[in-house]
Amino acid sequence: MKFSESWIREWVNPPIDHDQLIDQFTLAGLNVEESRKLNSNKFYGIVIAKIIECQVHPSLADTWIMTVNSGGGNIINIITNNMNYNKNTKVVVANIGAILPNGNIIKQINIQGRKSEGVLCTFSMLGLNYYTQKGIIELPIDAPIGCNFYDYLHFNDNIIDINITPNRGDCLSVIGLSREIAAINQCKLKKINIKSNVPNILDTIPIIIETPHDCPKFLGKVLKNIDITIPTPLKIQEKLIRCGIQPINIITDIANYVLLELGQPVRIFDYEKIDKNIIYVRFSKPGETLTLSENNINIKLFSKTLVISDVRKPLAIAGVITGNQSSVSCSTHNIFLKVAFFNPLTIINQYKLYNLYTSSVVRYEKGIDPDISELALNYATSLLIKYCHGKAGPTINIISHNHLPKIKIIKLHRSKLNMILGFYIPDQKIINILTNLGFQVETQGHNWIVSTPSWRFDINIEENVISEIIRIYGYNHIPKIPAKISLNQTVQCIPNQVISLSKSKTVLIARGYQEIITYSFVDPNIQKLLHPQCIPLTLMNPISTNMSVMRLSLWTGLIQTMLYNQNRQHKNIKLFESGICFIPKNSHSKQVSQQLRLSGIRSGLRHYEHWDIHTSLTDFYDIKGDVESILYLFNKKNQNNNIHFKSCTYPALHPGQSAEIYLNDIFLGYVGVIHPMIQYKLRIHSNVLVFELIWDSIVNIKSQKIIDISKFPKNYRDISLIIPTHISASSVIETCKKIGIINLTEVKLIDVYTGRNIPTNFKSLTIKLTLQSKTHTLKEQEIKEIIIICTTTLKKHFNAIFR
C-alpha cells in the first residue's frame, strides 16, 4: 500500500514528525518497506491567482493583457499570448522574483510599452512533466487566492510504502492506516463532509441477486447528465500519482480515489449500455464471454463464475474486472455507480481462475468493511456531482443480512490478560485502547465483553484482543522487570535434539556454510519439480501465489535463495537451514506429520580462488563429506554405529550422483546433485548439490562419548584386492568393521584403480587398516592374525582376489 504522508495527515495529524510516524507504523505491526521524499522540482514564489480582466494588447496581435489578483491586495498585469481562459478563472502565477525549477528568476519586462509583472505558469514550466494537459494551469474555483502553489499541492511530502499482511485488509486504505495512527496517539479521525445527496431524479435500476451467499450486499445509484470531459482536479490527480496510479479521466479517477481513501471498490457502468436497465448478480451461463476493457481480449467464462450482468450479457466478473461492453467512454453522460460486498472466498477462486489480480481483488480477497459501502457510494456521488455536475437518483440497496459477516463478541478476562502480558495495565487504559480501535467494550466485573469492529475480520479469539492491546500500548513500553530466581531451582535440561542440532550447525559453519531462514510457504511450481510424487498442504489464503503451499523439504527455499544469489553474481555458495517440513500422511487426507530437518546446498568452487591453491568445481564427494562430518558426531565406534550411503533414484536428484543416507541401518535422508532437467528449467548455471537429514530420526541415536587415547603406538597395513565393479567400497569397509576385532580401530579407502592389468568389469581397491591396542604394543604375530582374518572374510564375502 503506497500513499503520501500528507493524505494521512488530512485524516489525523498528531504532533509527531515523519520519523516518528514511520516508527509508529512499524511498532504497530505494519512493515514499512520504503519511505522517501517526494521527488518534485523545487520552485519558489509561485502562487494561486484569479483573473480579474482580460484585454487585447493595443500594439501586438494575438497578445492579451491579463489583470490578476495574486493575493494580499496585489493586483498585477501579465502579458500572454494564451487566451483560453475567462474572467474569474483561477490560475498559477509566478510573481516578480519567483524562482523556477530551471533556476530562472522572473523579472518585470516591458513589451511594446506595457509592463508584464509576472508569468502565467504551465505544468512544463514548473517541471511537472507527468501532466499531459497543455497550456496555462487552471485550478478549481475554490482554490485560495495568494496560496503558495507548492504548499497547495503539498509538494513537501513523503511517500510511504507499507507491506500489508493478509490479515490486515482493513489497512489497504488511507482511512484504515489513519485509524491506526489515531489509536496510537489517542486522536480523533476527521469525518468526511458529504453534502446531502437528496435525489433530484427518480431513475433507479432493478437489482436481482441470485446468489446472496456470494454477494450479500449490493448498492447502486443512477447519475445523469455527467460531464466526463472536465479535467480531474489537481489535488486528486496528485494523490493518485503519489499512490502509483496514473490519472485517466474524471470518472475513473474518482472511483480510484474513493478506493484508496476508503478501501471500497467502486464500479461505474455506462447507464445506456445496460440492456433493459436491469442488473443481475448471478453465475455465468454456458458459452458466455466477456471482452476485457483494458486490452480488448475476449475471454470465455468458466462455469460458476460470479458475474454482474444485464438481461442479455455479462457486464463484469464480480469483484475482479469490468468488461468493455458497459465501460465508460468519452461520449458517456449517464452512469450507474455500484458498490458491493462479496464473499472473499468467491473472489479468491475467481481471480485464480482467470489470473486477474486487480486492485479490487486485493481488497475483496482480504475482506472489506461491509458497513462502509453506503458511505463510499455517497462519497463518490458527491465528488462526481461536485466536479462533473449532473443529477443523482435514489440509492438502491439490496442486503441479505443472513449472509453478511457477523460481529464477533469475545470475553476478555483480566486474569488471562495479566498472565500473557506479565504486567498490569489499568482498566481505563485497556478500555481506551480498544475503544480507539473501534471495539465496543462493556465492563463485566473484572472482565470485559468486547465486540469487534465491522472492518476487523482477523479478530476471532481472546488472544487476538490481547495482542491488539499490547500492540497499541507499545512493546517498547513493557516494563523491565528483573527475573526472580531461586538458588534451589531445579535446572531444566536442554533436550538432546537442540544440543545435537546446535553442534551440527557449528560443524557446518566451520566448513564454510552460512545459515539461512526461509518461509514455510513455498512456490508450488518449484516444489512440484522437486517432489512430483507428493501432494503438499495448500494454503486457503496465501500471501501470494508463489507462497501458496507448505514445504515438503527445505530444498525449495535453499534453491530459491541460491538462485537469488546466483543472479547477483555470487558463484560460490554454501548454505544450510533447519526447520519444520510438512509431510502428508497419505494422499486421501489433509493430515500432515511435522518433521524437523536439516538441509544444505552448495555450488561453485571447492575452495576460494587463491594464487597458491589449485581449485576445481565442487562435486558429490564434497557434500558427502559435509554430511559425514555431521554424522560423525553420532558415530560411536565401539558400538558399531556405521555411516553408509546407498545409490538411489529420487526425482529431484541426478540418477547417477545421488544416494540415500544411513546410520546404523536407519534411513536419514538424501544427498546428491540436483537433476539436470530441474537445473535447466530453473536456469541454474552450475552444478548444485544438496543434502537433507531427517533430524527426528537422528536424535534417538546417542552421541559419541569421549574415550581415553591409547598411549601405545599405531600400526598401519594396506590390503589391495580386486572385486567386481558393482560392489561398493563402503560395503568392503563395513564388512571389515563388522568382524569385531577389538584392536582394529579404523578402516578407510585410500585408492581405486581400473585399467591395465585389471579384468573388465572389475576394479582394484586399496584399504588402510589402523591397528592399536589400549593395553600393550601389538606384536607382529598379532598384526598378521588380524590381517589374515580380514582377507579371509573379504574373500568369502566378495570372492576377492588379493594383489
From Swiss-Prot:
Keyword annotations for this protein?
A: Aminoacyl-tRNA synthetase, ATP-binding, Cytoplasm, Ligase, Magnesium, Metal-binding, Nucleotide-binding, Protein biosynthesis, RNA-binding, tRNA-binding
State whether keyword ATP-binding applies.
yes
Subunit composition and interactions = Tetramer of two alpha and two beta subunits.
NCBIfam families registered for this protein in UniProt = pheT_bact (TIGR00472)
Any single GO CC term annotated in Swiss-Prot or TrEMBL for this entry = phenylalanine-tRNA ligase complex
Ranges for domain FDX-ACB come to 710-803
Residue span(s) of domain B5: 405-480
The record's listing under PROSITE patterns reads:
B5 (PS51483), FDX_ACB (PS51447), TRBD (PS50886)
Q: Where in the chain are disulfide-linked cysteines found?
A: none
Reactions catalysed according to its record: tRNA(Phe) + L-phenylalanine + ATP = L-phenylalanyl-tRNA(Phe) + AMP + diphosphate + H(+)
Quick check: keyword Cytoplasm in the entry?
yes
Q: Which Pfam families match?
A: B3_4, B5, FDX-ACB, tRNA_bind, tRNA_synthFbeta
Report the PANTHER family cross-referenced here: PHENYLALANINE--TRNA LIGASE BETA SUBUNIT, PHENYLALANYL-TRNA SYNTHETASE BETA CHAIN AND LEUCINE-RICH REPEAT-CONTAINING PROTEIN 47
Q: Record's family?
A: Belongs to the phenylalanyl-tRNA synthetase beta subunit family. Type 1 subfamily.
Which residues are in the tRNA-binding domain?
Answer: 40-150
| GO MF entry, a single one | phenylalanine-tRNA ligase activity
From which source organism is this entry? Blochmanniella floridana
EC id: 6.1.1.20
Instruction: Output this protein's name.
Output: Phenylalanine--tRNA ligase beta subunit
Q: Which cofactor does it need?
A: Mg(2+)
Q: How is the cofactor bound?
A: Binds 2 magnesium ions per tetramer.
Localization per record? Cytoplasm
Biological processes annotated in GO: phenylalanyl-tRNA aminoacylation
Identify which top EC class this enzyme belongs to: ligase
